[in-house]
Amino acid sequence: LKNKKISITTKKKLLKEKEILLAGYNLFVTRGVEKTAIDDIVKLAGVAKGTFYLYFKDKYDLLDQLILQKSNEIIKDGLKKANSLGIDDFRKRTLFFLDYIISYLKENKSLLKLINKNISWGLYRKAMMKPKEYDEIKNVLDIFVRNLTNYGIQKDEAEMTLFMIIELVGSVCFTTIILKEPTDIESIKPILFKKILSMIGV
């Protein structure tokens, strides 16, 4: 009976956290982060303000968790697709994976705006420190770095290469999909992929 009560309490906590995350996401993509107050988030989530602080330090902590959660979901779906097609070659797998993410962001422009303005390498470092919560992110980062080190590249250089690819893809996606400059994403994608292949150099 005691375990059942604990289970119910845990479920309620997870539900409240989920409601706060959902409310935060909806407000961030419609109003923007700066124009969204914690009062707005808790009102939409239907929870007390004190409840918010049980899960998040502030709205930026909520934003970080949202970005990591969404990134984890996209990466998980991308991995499923790659696995279902049986793509094992590192270069082909990398390009397929990036193409999947680009296509997803193209269809979800609000998410692209949110991610592009607030993503950082430090955020992915945070994901590496919480492998249970963001297992897919950690898995992909580990595999990428390990593949490069297998080709004789130093681990530090492999991590910096990954950082540059994340920055490059994010910047190109935002500029071409949102600003539509200097061309559309489909036109620039072959050049982008060519540059990425030269960066990983394997």
Per-region residue spans from a language model:
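Alpha-helical DNA-contacting segments of helix-turn-helix folds
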Residues: 56, 63-73, 77-78, 115, ...
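Hydrophobic alpha-helical segments that form the core
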Residues: 155-178, 187-199
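Hydrophobic alpha-helical connector segments
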Residues: 65, 80-107, 165
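Amphipathic alpha-helical packing segments from all-alpha helical-bundle domains
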Residues: 72, 76, 124-152, 159-163, ...
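Hydrophobic/aromatic residues within well-ordered alpha-helical segments
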Residues: 16, 59, 70-74, 97, ...
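Helix-turn-helix
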Residues: 19, 27-61, 65
